[in-house]
UniProtKB/Swiss-Prot annotation:
It comes from the Eukaryota. The gene is cyp-44A1. It comes from Caenorhabditis elegans. This is Probable cytochrome P450 CYP44. InterPro entries: CYP11_CYP27_families, Cyt_P450, Cyt_P450_CS, Cyt_P450_E_grp-I, Cyt_P450_sf. Residues 12-31 are annotated as: Disordered. Its cofactor is heme. Belongs to the cytochrome P450 family. CDD domains: CYP24A1-like.
Length: 489
Protein backbone atom coordinates (compact mmCIF):
# COMPACT_ATOMS: atom_id res chain seq x y z
CA UNK A 1 0.00 0.00 0.00
CA UNK A 2 2.77 2.42 0.88
CA UNK A 3 4.52 1.65 -2.41
CA UNK A 4 1.31 2.51 -4.29
CA UNK A 5 1.11 5.84 -2.47
CA UNK A 6 4.72 6.60 -3.38
CA UNK A 7 4.10 5.68 -7.03
CA UNK A 8 1.07 7.96 -7.19
CA UNK A 9 2.87 10.75 -5.38
CA UNK A 10 5.64 10.80 -8.01
CA UNK A 11 3.18 12.38 -10.46
CA UNK A 12 1.68 14.94 -8.09
CA UNK A 13 4.01 17.80 -9.05
CA UNK A 14 3.11 17.38 -12.73
CA UNK A 15 -0.52 18.19 -12.02
CA UNK A 16 -2.11 21.66 -12.12
CA UNK A 17 -2.93 22.09 -8.46
CA UNK A 18 -1.06 24.13 -5.89
CA UNK A 19 -0.75 23.31 -2.17
CA UNK A 20 -3.03 25.16 0.22
CA UNK A 21 -0.44 26.10 2.82
CA UNK A 22 3.29 26.60 3.26
CA UNK A 23 5.24 24.21 5.49
CA UNK A 24 6.59 27.32 7.26
CA UNK A 25 3.11 28.52 8.24
CA UNK A 26 2.04 27.47 11.76
CA UNK A 27 -1.10 25.30 11.62
CA UNK A 28 -4.40 26.78 12.69
CA UNK A 29 -6.58 25.08 15.29
CA UNK A 30 -9.38 22.61 14.60
CA UNK A 31 -11.94 25.12 15.86
CA UNK A 32 -10.89 27.54 13.11
CA UNK A 33 -11.81 25.22 10.25
CA UNK A 34 -14.55 27.01 8.28
CA UNK A 35 -18.08 25.68 8.09
CA UNK A 36 -21.76 26.50 8.60
CA UNK A 37 -22.72 28.31 11.81
CA UNK A 38 -23.29 25.99 14.77
CA UNK A 39 -26.19 25.89 17.21
CA UNK A 40 -25.65 24.17 20.59
CA UNK A 41 -26.90 20.56 20.59
CA UNK A 42 -28.46 20.98 17.14
CA UNK A 43 -25.16 21.45 15.28
CA UNK A 44 -24.68 23.18 11.94
CA UNK A 45 -27.57 24.99 10.33
CA UNK A 46 -26.76 23.48 6.95
CA UNK A 47 -26.91 19.94 8.24
CA UNK A 48 -29.90 20.62 10.52
CA UNK A 49 -31.90 21.51 7.42
CA UNK A 50 -31.66 17.86 6.43
CA UNK A 51 -32.55 16.69 9.93
CA UNK A 52 -35.73 18.78 10.04
CA UNK A 53 -36.75 18.42 6.41
CA UNK A 54 -35.94 14.74 6.04
CA UNK A 55 -38.31 14.33 3.12
CA UNK A 56 -37.36 12.67 -0.15
CA UNK A 57 -36.80 15.89 -2.10
CA UNK A 58 -34.38 17.30 0.47
CA UNK A 59 -32.44 14.06 0.91
CA UNK A 60 -32.07 13.54 -2.83
CA UNK A 61 -30.12 16.80 -3.11
CA UNK A 62 -27.51 16.02 -0.44
CA UNK A 63 -24.75 15.77 -3.06
CA UNK A 64 -25.59 19.33 -4.14
CA UNK A 65 -25.35 20.43 -0.50
CA UNK A 66 -21.76 19.15 -0.46
CA UNK A 67 -20.89 21.03 -3.66
CA UNK A 68 -22.40 24.22 -2.27
CA UNK A 69 -20.32 23.91 0.91
CA UNK A 70 -17.16 23.58 -1.17
CA UNK A 71 -18.02 26.68 -3.21
CA UNK A 72 -18.83 28.69 -0.08
CA UNK A 73 -16.12 27.60 2.38
CA UNK A 74 -13.28 26.22 0.28
CA UNK A 75 -11.11 23.12 0.30
CA UNK A 76 -11.80 22.06 3.88
CA UNK A 77 -15.13 22.33 5.72
CA UNK A 78 -16.16 21.26 9.22
CA UNK A 79 -19.70 20.16 10.07
CA UNK A 80 -21.10 19.52 13.53
CA UNK A 81 -23.64 16.75 13.03
CA UNK A 82 -25.37 17.59 16.31
CA UNK A 83 -27.48 15.50 18.68
CA UNK A 84 -24.51 13.69 20.19
CA UNK A 85 -22.87 12.88 16.88
CA UNK A 86 -19.29 13.93 16.21
CA UNK A 87 -17.82 16.41 13.77
CA UNK A 88 -17.08 15.44 10.20
CA UNK A 89 -14.42 17.23 8.16
CA UNK A 90 -15.04 17.41 4.41
CA UNK A 91 -11.93 17.72 2.24
CA UNK A 92 -11.82 18.75 -1.42
CA UNK A 93 -8.05 19.04 -1.94
CA UNK A 94 -6.13 16.07 -3.43
CA UNK A 95 -3.07 17.03 -1.37
CA UNK A 96 -5.15 16.53 1.78
CA UNK A 97 -6.49 13.28 0.34
CA UNK A 98 -2.93 12.05 -0.03
CA UNK A 99 -2.14 13.02 3.57
CA UNK A 100 -5.17 11.17 4.94
CA UNK A 101 -4.64 8.00 2.91
CA UNK A 102 -0.90 7.88 3.58
CA UNK A 103 -1.74 7.71 7.30
CA UNK A 104 -4.10 4.74 6.85
CA UNK A 105 -1.92 2.04 8.33
CA UNK A 106 -2.72 -1.66 8.19
CA UNK A 107 -6.36 -1.32 9.21
CA UNK A 108 -7.94 1.96 8.08
CA UNK A 109 -10.98 3.00 10.11
CA UNK A 110 -14.16 4.22 8.46
CA UNK A 111 -17.59 5.54 9.39
CA UNK A 112 -20.09 2.86 8.27
CA UNK A 113 -21.96 3.85 5.12
CA UNK A 114 -25.20 2.40 6.48
CA UNK A 115 -25.44 2.78 10.24
CA UNK A 116 -28.93 1.30 10.09
CA UNK A 117 -27.68 -1.93 8.50
CA UNK A 118 -24.92 -2.15 11.10
CA UNK A 119 -27.46 -1.67 13.92
CA UNK A 120 -29.84 -4.22 12.41
CA UNK A 121 -27.20 -6.91 12.02
CA UNK A 122 -25.84 -6.40 15.52
CA UNK A 123 -29.39 -6.56 16.90
CA UNK A 124 -29.86 -9.89 15.12
CA UNK A 125 -26.55 -11.26 16.41
CA UNK A 126 -24.98 -11.09 12.96
CA UNK A 127 -21.56 -9.86 11.95
CA UNK A 128 -21.95 -6.23 10.71
CA UNK A 129 -20.21 -7.05 7.40
CA UNK A 130 -17.07 -5.88 5.62
CA UNK A 131 -18.36 -2.36 4.98
CA UNK A 132 -19.32 -1.79 8.62
CA UNK A 133 -16.36 -3.40 10.39
CA UNK A 134 -13.11 -1.88 11.64
CA UNK A 135 -9.97 -3.20 13.28
CA UNK A 136 -8.66 -6.79 13.55
CA UNK A 137 -11.98 -8.49 12.68
CA UNK A 138 -12.25 -6.49 9.45
CA UNK A 139 -8.63 -7.28 8.61
CA UNK A 140 -9.16 -11.01 9.21
CA UNK A 141 -12.13 -11.24 6.85
CA UNK A 142 -10.70 -8.90 4.23
CA UNK A 143 -7.40 -10.79 4.13
CA UNK A 144 -9.30 -14.01 3.42
CA UNK A 145 -10.81 -12.67 0.20
CA UNK A 146 -7.89 -10.57 -1.01
CA UNK A 147 -6.39 -13.26 -3.26
CA UNK A 148 -9.67 -14.28 -4.87
CA UNK A 149 -10.99 -10.79 -5.55
CA UNK A 150 -8.24 -8.24 -6.02
CA UNK A 151 -5.71 -10.01 -8.27
CA UNK A 152 -6.43 -9.68 -12.01
CA UNK A 153 -5.27 -13.24 -12.74
CA UNK A 154 -7.68 -14.59 -10.11
CA UNK A 155 -10.65 -12.61 -11.43
CA UNK A 156 -9.93 -13.97 -14.93
CA UNK A 157 -11.14 -17.32 -13.59
CA UNK A 158 -14.66 -15.89 -13.55
CA UNK A 159 -14.57 -14.51 -17.11
CA UNK A 160 -16.51 -17.46 -18.63
CA UNK A 161 -19.35 -16.86 -16.16
CA UNK A 162 -19.34 -13.14 -16.92
CA UNK A 163 -19.62 -14.01 -20.60
CA UNK A 164 -22.59 -16.29 -19.92
CA UNK A 165 -24.39 -13.43 -18.15
CA UNK A 166 -23.54 -10.95 -20.92
CA UNK A 167 -25.00 -13.32 -23.53
CA UNK A 168 -28.14 -13.68 -21.41
CA UNK A 169 -28.33 -9.87 -21.16
CA UNK A 170 -28.22 -9.46 -24.95
CA UNK A 171 -31.06 -11.97 -25.34
CA UNK A 172 -33.09 -10.36 -22.55
CA UNK A 173 -32.68 -6.89 -24.09
CA UNK A 174 -33.83 -8.27 -27.46
CA UNK A 175 -36.90 -9.79 -25.82
CA UNK A 176 -37.77 -6.57 -23.95
CA UNK A 177 -37.27 -4.46 -27.09
CA UNK A 178 -39.53 -6.76 -29.11
CA UNK A 179 -42.26 -6.91 -26.46
CA UNK A 180 -42.37 -3.27 -25.38
CA UNK A 181 -40.69 -1.27 -28.15
CA UNK A 182 -38.29 0.20 -25.59
CA UNK A 183 -36.18 -1.23 -22.75
CA UNK A 184 -36.49 -0.11 -19.12
CA UNK A 185 -32.85 -0.42 -18.07
CA UNK A 186 -33.72 0.41 -14.46
CA UNK A 187 -35.26 -3.05 -14.26
CA UNK A 188 -32.97 -4.84 -16.70
CA UNK A 189 -29.74 -3.58 -15.14
CA UNK A 190 -30.86 -4.80 -11.73
CA UNK A 191 -31.72 -8.23 -13.11
CA UNK A 192 -28.32 -8.34 -14.85
CA UNK A 193 -26.48 -7.47 -11.64
CA UNK A 194 -28.44 -10.09 -9.70
CA UNK A 195 -27.71 -12.77 -12.30
CA UNK A 196 -24.01 -11.92 -12.24
CA UNK A 197 -24.01 -12.20 -8.44
CA UNK A 198 -25.61 -15.62 -8.74
CA UNK A 199 -22.92 -16.89 -11.08
CA UNK A 200 -20.00 -15.42 -9.11
CA UNK A 201 -21.15 -15.78 -5.50
CA UNK A 202 -23.67 -18.64 -5.47
CA UNK A 203 -22.25 -20.62 -8.40
CA UNK A 204 -25.53 -20.93 -10.28
CA UNK A 205 -27.98 -19.05 -12.46
CA UNK A 206 -30.73 -17.29 -10.51
CA UNK A 207 -32.95 -16.95 -13.58
CA UNK A 208 -33.02 -13.17 -13.14
CA UNK A 209 -32.77 -12.56 -16.89
CA UNK A 210 -35.20 -15.37 -17.62
CA UNK A 211 -38.21 -16.99 -15.99
CA UNK A 212 -37.57 -15.55 -12.50
CA UNK A 213 -37.44 -11.87 -13.45
CA UNK A 214 -40.45 -11.01 -11.26
CA UNK A 215 -38.76 -12.56 -8.21
CA UNK A 216 -35.60 -10.63 -9.08
CA UNK A 217 -37.55 -7.37 -9.37
CA UNK A 218 -38.98 -7.88 -5.89
CA UNK A 219 -35.55 -8.42 -4.33
CA UNK A 220 -34.12 -5.41 -6.18
CA UNK A 221 -37.00 -3.23 -4.97
CA UNK A 222 -36.40 -4.33 -1.37
CA UNK A 223 -32.74 -3.36 -1.64
CA UNK A 224 -33.67 0.00 -3.14
CA UNK A 225 -36.10 0.77 -0.31
CA UNK A 226 -33.43 -0.10 2.27
CA UNK A 227 -30.99 2.36 0.71
CA UNK A 228 -33.64 5.09 0.42
CA UNK A 229 -34.71 4.76 4.04
CA UNK A 230 -31.10 4.47 5.20
CA UNK A 231 -30.33 7.83 3.57
CA UNK A 232 -33.31 9.47 5.26
CA UNK A 233 -32.31 8.11 8.67
CA UNK A 234 -28.66 9.04 8.17
CA UNK A 235 -29.49 12.68 7.47
CA UNK A 236 -32.50 12.94 9.75
CA UNK A 237 -32.79 13.27 13.51
CA UNK A 238 -31.04 10.17 14.97
CA UNK A 239 -33.89 9.29 17.32
CA UNK A 240 -33.82 5.66 16.14
CA UNK A 241 -30.60 5.24 18.14
CA UNK A 242 -32.60 5.66 21.34
CA UNK A 243 -36.15 4.59 20.52
CA UNK A 244 -37.91 2.19 18.18
CA UNK A 245 -39.28 4.77 15.75
CA UNK A 246 -41.69 4.02 12.86
CA UNK A 247 -38.79 4.45 10.43
CA UNK A 248 -36.67 1.98 12.38
CA UNK A 249 -39.48 -0.59 12.52
CA UNK A 250 -39.95 -0.23 8.77
CA UNK A 251 -36.21 -0.68 8.27
CA UNK A 252 -36.20 -3.87 10.36
CA UNK A 253 -39.08 -5.25 8.29
CA UNK A 254 -37.30 -4.47 5.00
CA UNK A 255 -34.02 -5.95 6.23
CA UNK A 256 -35.84 -9.06 7.49
CA UNK A 257 -37.40 -9.64 4.07
CA UNK A 258 -34.17 -8.99 2.20
CA UNK A 259 -32.00 -11.11 4.47
CA UNK A 260 -34.38 -14.07 4.48
CA UNK A 261 -34.17 -14.25 0.68
CA UNK A 262 -30.40 -13.87 0.53
CA UNK A 263 -29.88 -16.26 3.46
CA UNK A 264 -31.79 -18.94 1.55
CA UNK A 265 -29.59 -18.36 -1.51
CA UNK A 266 -26.45 -18.64 0.60
CA UNK A 267 -27.59 -21.80 2.40
CA UNK A 268 -28.63 -23.46 -0.88
CA UNK A 269 -25.21 -22.71 -2.37
CA UNK A 270 -23.13 -23.69 0.66
CA UNK A 271 -25.05 -26.91 1.34
CA UNK A 272 -24.12 -28.17 -2.14
CA UNK A 273 -20.44 -27.33 -1.86
CA UNK A 274 -17.83 -29.54 -0.29
CA UNK A 275 -14.45 -28.92 1.24
CA UNK A 276 -11.81 -29.96 -1.27
CA UNK A 277 -8.22 -30.73 -0.40
CA UNK A 278 -7.02 -29.77 -3.89
CA UNK A 279 -5.50 -26.42 -4.84
CA UNK A 280 -8.10 -23.68 -4.29
CA UNK A 281 -6.64 -21.14 -6.72
CA UNK A 282 -8.99 -22.14 -9.57
CA UNK A 283 -12.13 -22.53 -7.45
CA UNK A 284 -15.15 -20.29 -7.79
CA UNK A 285 -15.76 -17.81 -5.04
CA UNK A 286 -17.99 -19.65 -2.55
CA UNK A 287 -15.96 -22.84 -3.00
CA UNK A 288 -12.80 -20.85 -2.38
CA UNK A 289 -14.22 -19.42 0.84
CA UNK A 290 -15.35 -22.70 2.37
CA UNK A 291 -11.88 -24.11 1.71
CA UNK A 292 -10.23 -21.35 3.74
CA UNK A 293 -9.43 -23.04 7.05
CA UNK A 294 -9.55 -19.76 8.96
CA UNK A 295 -13.19 -19.14 7.95
CA UNK A 296 -16.24 -20.81 9.45
CA UNK A 297 -19.67 -20.92 7.83
CA UNK A 298 -20.76 -17.73 9.60
CA UNK A 299 -17.71 -15.90 8.23
CA UNK A 300 -18.40 -17.15 4.72
CA UNK A 301 -22.00 -15.94 4.87
CA UNK A 302 -20.92 -12.52 6.13
CA UNK A 303 -18.58 -12.12 3.16
CA UNK A 304 -21.14 -13.38 0.63
CA UNK A 305 -23.85 -11.09 2.04
CA UNK A 306 -21.53 -8.07 1.92
CA UNK A 307 -20.49 -8.77 -1.66
CA UNK A 308 -24.05 -9.48 -2.78
CA UNK A 309 -25.72 -6.38 -1.34
CA UNK A 310 -22.86 -4.04 -2.30
CA UNK A 311 -22.70 -5.34 -5.87
CA UNK A 312 -26.46 -5.14 -6.36
CA UNK A 313 -26.43 -1.49 -5.27
CA UNK A 314 -23.44 -0.29 -7.30
CA UNK A 315 -22.93 -2.29 -10.50
CA UNK A 316 -26.46 -1.91 -11.90
CA UNK A 317 -26.42 1.93 -11.79
CA UNK A 318 -23.00 1.96 -13.45
CA UNK A 319 -24.34 -0.08 -16.37
CA UNK A 320 -27.11 2.51 -16.81
CA UNK A 321 -24.68 5.44 -16.61
CA UNK A 322 -22.39 3.84 -19.20
CA UNK A 323 -25.24 3.15 -21.60
CA UNK A 324 -26.50 6.70 -21.17
CA UNK A 325 -23.12 8.21 -22.00
CA UNK A 326 -22.73 6.03 -25.07
CA UNK A 327 -26.32 6.55 -26.24
CA UNK A 328 -26.00 10.33 -25.97
CA UNK A 329 -22.55 10.35 -27.60
CA UNK A 330 -23.03 8.29 -30.79
CA UNK A 331 -19.51 9.09 -31.98
CA UNK A 332 -18.13 7.24 -28.94
CA UNK A 333 -20.48 4.31 -29.55
CA UNK A 334 -19.34 4.09 -33.18
CA UNK A 335 -15.69 4.12 -32.08
CA UNK A 336 -16.38 1.18 -29.75
CA UNK A 337 -18.21 -0.72 -32.49
CA UNK A 338 -15.27 -0.11 -34.82
CA UNK A 339 -12.89 -1.36 -32.12
CA UNK A 340 -14.93 -4.56 -31.68
CA UNK A 341 -15.30 -5.15 -35.43
CA UNK A 342 -11.58 -4.81 -36.10
CA UNK A 343 -10.69 -7.45 -33.51
CA UNK A 344 -13.75 -9.34 -32.19
CA UNK A 345 -11.68 -11.67 -30.03
CA UNK A 346 -9.66 -8.94 -28.35
CA UNK A 347 -10.10 -8.22 -24.67
CA UNK A 348 -8.06 -5.00 -24.80
CA UNK A 349 -10.91 -2.74 -25.98
CA UNK A 350 -8.88 0.34 -25.13
CA UNK A 351 -11.50 2.91 -26.06
CA UNK A 352 -14.35 1.09 -24.28
CA UNK A 353 -12.20 0.92 -21.15
CA UNK A 354 -11.61 4.68 -21.41
CA UNK A 355 -15.38 5.23 -21.72
CA UNK A 356 -16.02 3.17 -18.59
CA UNK A 357 -13.33 5.08 -16.71
CA UNK A 358 -14.80 8.40 -17.83
CA UNK A 359 -18.27 7.29 -16.74
CA UNK A 360 -16.98 6.50 -13.25
CA UNK A 361 -15.63 10.06 -13.19
CA UNK A 362 -18.79 11.76 -14.46
CA UNK A 363 -21.22 9.63 -12.46
CA UNK A 364 -19.47 8.64 -9.21
CA UNK A 365 -21.51 6.08 -7.33
CA UNK A 366 -20.78 7.60 -3.91
CA UNK A 367 -20.43 11.08 -2.45
CA UNK A 368 -17.32 10.32 -0.44
CA UNK A 369 -14.57 7.97 0.67
CA UNK A 370 -14.63 8.04 4.46
CA UNK A 371 -11.88 7.64 7.03
CA UNK A 372 -11.53 8.09 10.78
CA UNK A 373 -8.08 9.53 11.45
CA UNK A 374 -5.87 7.38 13.67
CA UNK A 375 -3.26 10.07 14.26
CA UNK A 376 -3.13 13.87 14.39
CA UNK A 377 -2.93 15.39 10.89
CA UNK A 378 -2.49 18.80 9.28
CA UNK A 379 -5.02 19.30 6.48
CA UNK A 380 -5.08 22.52 4.45
CA UNK A 381 -3.10 24.15 7.25
CA UNK A 382 -5.51 23.13 10.04
CA UNK A 383 -4.98 20.71 12.91
CA UNK A 384 -7.23 17.65 12.66
CA UNK A 385 -6.97 15.43 15.77
CA UNK A 386 -6.96 11.65 15.81
CA UNK A 387 -10.43 10.13 15.92
CA UNK A 388 -11.97 12.69 13.54
CA UNK A 389 -14.29 11.54 10.76
CA UNK A 390 -12.97 12.79 7.42
CA UNK A 391 -14.97 12.60 4.19
CA UNK A 392 -12.95 12.68 0.97
CA UNK A 393 -15.53 14.23 -1.33
CA UNK A 394 -14.90 12.33 -4.55
CA UNK A 395 -18.17 13.61 -5.99
CA UNK A 396 -16.63 17.09 -6.19
CA UNK A 397 -13.00 16.09 -6.83
CA UNK A 398 -13.73 14.01 -9.93
CA UNK A 399 -15.52 16.92 -11.63
CA UNK A 400 -13.21 19.68 -10.42
CA UNK A 401 -12.66 22.59 -12.84
CA UNK A 402 -8.92 22.80 -12.06
CA UNK A 403 -8.14 19.11 -11.67
CA UNK A 404 -10.05 18.27 -14.86
CA UNK A 405 -9.60 21.53 -16.73
CA UNK A 406 -10.62 20.06 -20.09
CA UNK A 407 -14.42 20.38 -19.78
CA UNK A 408 -14.95 18.51 -16.49
CA UNK A 409 -18.73 18.31 -16.96
CA UNK A 410 -18.45 16.77 -20.42
CA UNK A 411 -18.01 13.16 -21.49
CA UNK A 412 -14.50 12.97 -22.93
CA UNK A 413 -13.05 9.45 -22.76
CA UNK A 414 -10.08 10.64 -24.83
CA UNK A 415 -8.71 12.37 -21.73
CA UNK A 416 -7.63 8.94 -20.42
CA UNK A 417 -5.81 8.10 -23.66
CA UNK A 418 -3.75 11.30 -23.89
CA UNK A 419 -0.61 10.91 -21.81
CA UNK A 420 0.14 14.62 -22.12
CA UNK A 421 -2.83 15.42 -19.87
CA UNK A 422 -1.84 14.49 -16.35
CA UNK A 423 -4.57 13.97 -13.74
CA UNK A 424 -3.75 14.35 -10.07
CA UNK A 425 -3.48 10.75 -8.81
CA UNK A 426 -5.59 11.47 -5.73
CA UNK A 427 -8.37 13.22 -7.64
CA UNK A 428 -9.76 10.04 -9.20
CA UNK A 429 -10.77 7.44 -6.60
CA UNK A 430 -13.99 5.75 -7.81
CA UNK A 431 -13.25 2.58 -5.84
CA UNK A 432 -11.57 4.11 -2.82
CA UNK A 433 -7.91 3.47 -2.08
CA UNK A 434 -5.51 1.18 -0.26
CA UNK A 435 -6.55 -1.66 2.04
CA UNK A 436 -10.21 -0.54 2.01
CA UNK A 437 -10.51 -0.27 -1.75
CA UNK A 438 -13.78 -1.80 -2.97
CA UNK A 439 -13.31 -5.57 -2.71
CA UNK A 440 -15.50 -6.21 -5.75
CA UNK A 441 -13.73 -3.70 -7.99
CA UNK A 442 -12.26 -6.15 -10.48
CA UNK A 443 -15.48 -8.16 -10.70
CA UNK A 444 -17.42 -4.96 -11.46
CA UNK A 445 -14.93 -3.82 -14.10
CA UNK A 446 -14.94 -7.23 -15.78
CA UNK A 447 -18.75 -7.47 -15.78
CA UNK A 448 -19.14 -3.96 -17.20
CA UNK A 449 -16.52 -4.47 -19.90
CA UNK A 450 -17.90 -7.84 -20.99
CA UNK A 451 -21.57 -6.82 -21.06
CA UNK A 452 -21.03 -3.39 -22.63
CA UNK A 453 -18.90 -4.97 -25.36
CA UNK A 454 -21.71 -7.44 -26.11
CA UNK A 455 -24.40 -4.75 -26.17
CA UNK A 456 -22.37 -2.30 -28.26
CA UNK A 457 -21.31 -5.05 -30.66
CA UNK A 458 -24.92 -6.08 -31.28
CA UNK A 459 -26.96 -2.89 -31.06
CA UNK A 460 -27.17 0.73 -31.95
CA UNK A 461 -28.27 2.31 -28.67
CA UNK A 462 -30.37 5.43 -28.13
CA UNK A 463 -31.67 7.03 -24.94
CA UNK A 464 -35.35 8.01 -24.88
CA UNK A 465 -36.75 10.48 -22.37
CA UNK A 466 -35.49 13.10 -19.95
CA UNK A 467 -31.73 13.37 -19.27
CA UNK A 468 -30.31 11.16 -16.54
CA UNK A 469 -28.80 12.91 -13.53
CA UNK A 470 -28.15 11.66 -9.99
CA UNK A 471 -30.01 11.60 -6.69
CA UNK A 472 -28.68 10.77 -3.24
CA UNK A 473 -30.09 7.57 -1.75
CA UNK A 474 -27.09 6.59 0.41
CA UNK A 475 -25.38 6.14 -2.97
CA UNK A 476 -25.72 8.38 -6.04
CA UNK A 477 -28.36 6.65 -8.14
CA UNK A 478 -29.97 7.49 -11.50
CA UNK A 479 -32.62 10.20 -11.65
CA UNK A 480 -34.53 10.58 -14.89
CA UNK A 481 -35.80 8.30 -17.62
CA UNK A 482 -33.77 5.09 -17.91
CA UNK A 483 -35.54 4.00 -21.09
CA UNK A 484 -33.41 2.97 -24.07
CA UNK A 485 -33.96 1.80 -27.62
CA UNK A 486 -31.79 -1.02 -28.95
CA UNK A 487 -31.65 -1.47 -32.74
CA UNK A 488 -29.99 -4.61 -34.06
CA UNK A 489 -26.88 -3.86 -36.11
Amino acid sequence: MRRSIRNLAENVEKCPYSPTSSPNTPPRTFSEIPGPREIPVIGNIGYFKYAVKSDAKTIENYNQHLEEMYKKYGKIVKENLGFGRKYVVHIFDPADVQTVLAADGKTPFIVPLQETTQKYREMKGMNPGLGNLNGPEWYRLRSSVQHAMMRPQSVQTYLPFSQIVSNDLVCHVADQQKRFGLVDMQKVAGRWSLESAGQILFEKSLGSLGNRSEWADGLIELNKKIFQLSAKMRLGLPIFRLFSTPSWRKMVDLEDQFYSEVDRLMDDALDKLKVNDSDSKDMRFASYLINRKELNRRDVKVILLSMFSDGLSTTAPMLIYNLYNLATHPEALKEIQKEIKEDPASSKLTFLRACIKETFRMFPIGTEVSRVTQKNLILSGYEVPAGTAVDINTNVLMRHEVLFSDSPREFKPQRWLEKSKEVHPFAYLPFGFGPRMCAGRRFAEQDLLTSLAKLCGNYDIRHRGDPITQIYETLLLPRGDCTFEFKKL
